[in-house]
Structures are given as structure tokens and as C-alpha cells.
Amino acid sequence: MKLVLMGLPGAGKGTQAEQIVEKYNIPHISTGDMFRAAMKNNTELGKKAKSFMDNGDLVPDEVTNGIVRERLAEDDAKNGFLLDGFPRTVEQAEELENILSDLGTELDAVINIEVDKDVLMKRLTGRWICRTCGKTYHEIYNPPKVPGKCDLDGGELYQREDDKKETVENRLNVNMKQTKPLLDFYSEKGKLHSINGEQDINDVFVDVEKILASF
């Protein structure tokens, strides 16, 4: 079973990825993990990726695609995998098709976890952290007993810059703009399966299982 998992930040992709790889016994392959492994193993592509990252530059497609090609050729990916964070562009999606074709296989499905932007905003901007002990709260899902104070030590709660409304909204807008052409690409190929990510976590996974039952 060869899958790509998609979803905007806050959609619950990580939770579903954990359940998918456990149930179907396939490796969870994320771009971050691939880069780290390639750099740790000091491969040629890993060295190239490191040089770009050390300079604060984006890793070009030819390097990213090469690292993906190496990873998907490994033994543990022969019977399936869950790709997370790749592809990000239509060009990368086309290259993924070429990589899989060279390996004598193809993608089975692309699962997209859909959540309304307003819901994502609530999920992502509600996080507050205790300055003293680092305990995390969420103003909707896990609020402190006293607003602005930590339950454990009474420490002041603060919000990281990444979790502030303007930052989150900008990140979501950028992601939505990037993702749309990719969703259209896979929809035209008949590979795209969208799931309502606003349900309970277990209900989302039930929907995932229904899709994967046909493969």
C-alpha cells in the first residue's frame, strides 16, 4: 500500500499517520526524517542538502527528489509506505510518478484530511505555555482552571510567536495556495480521497480504513 498523506497544519495529520503505519505495518516516511537520515549517513545527497540548509536556503527539487528516490528504493518500502511532506508541488508529484515507475510500481492513494480554516485557526491559536514549567494548555481543548495561570505552579501563561493569530493565518494561507494545484493534480488522476478531519480522531481513522479497504 503506497500512500501520500496531505492536510494543512492543525488538521491532525500526525495522529492519523501514526495509526496508519501501525495498522498497515508500512514505514512513515517524512521529508524531515529523510533529510536527517541522509545527512547522518553522509550520503552525497545528504551532504548537498546540508550545505543548502546550513546557508538557510531551500533544498532544491533535484536534491529532495534524489533523497526520496533513495529512500523509496530501500527494502522496508517495497511493500508500501506513507509519504508525509512530499510531494509539495506538482513538479515533485510528477517526479514521484517517475520514481515509482522506475521501481515498477505506482501510488495507490492520496489521503487529504480536510478541516475548515476557521477550525484550524481555533486549533492552532489556542495554545498557551507556562513560563515556569513549560506545561502546555489549549484555551478550548485543555484550558487552565484560572485564565492566564498554570494549574501546577501558578506561572504566567504566554503564547509563542508561531501560535499568534497573524502568524498562523499567514501560514495557513501560504499552505492553502501551495496545496490547491497538488490536490487538483491528484484529483484528475483519480487518486485523491478527502476525509472530514473535523470529526473525532477515531472517526477520522474509520474513514481512512474505509478508503484503504479497497487496496
Swiss-Prot record:
Binding locations of ATP: 10-15, 127, 136-137, 199
Pathway named in the protein's UniProt entry: Purine metabolism; AMP biosynthesis via salvage pathway; AMP from ADP: step 1/1
GO terms for biological process, alphabetical: AMP salvage
Compartments in which it is found: Cytoplasm
Alphabetical list of CDD domains matching this protein: ADK
Record: residues binding AMP: 31, 36, 57-59, 85-88, 92, 160, 171
Any one Gene Ontology molecular-function term assigned to this protein's record: ATP binding
The protein's Enzyme Commission number: 2.7.4.3
Keywords of the record: ATP-binding, Cytoplasm, Kinase, Metal-binding, Nucleotide biosynthesis, Nucleotide-binding, Transferase, Zinc
Primary location class: cytoplasm
Pfam family, one: ADK
Annotated binding of Zn(2+), by residue: 130, 133, 150, 153
Region of interest: LID: 126-163
A GO cellular-component term linked to this record: cytoplasm
Enzyme class: transferase
Function: Catalyzes the reversible transfer of the terminal phosphate group between ATP and AMP. Plays an important role in cellular energy homeostasis and in adenine nucleotide metabolism.
HAMAP family per UniProt: Adenylate_kinase_Adk
Assembly with partners or alone: Monomer.
Domain notes: Consists of three domains, a large central CORE domain and two small peripheral domains, NMPbind and LID, which undergo movements during catalysis. The LID domain closes over the site of phosphoryl transfer upon ATP binding. Assembling and dissambling the active center during each catalytic cycle provides an effective means to prevent ATP hydrolysis. Some bacteria have evolved a zinc-coordinating structure that stabilizes the LID domain.
Family: Belongs to the adenylate kinase family.
Name assigned to this protein: Adenylate kinase
Source organism of this protein record: Listeria innocua serovar 6a (strain ATCC BAA-680 / CLIP 11262)
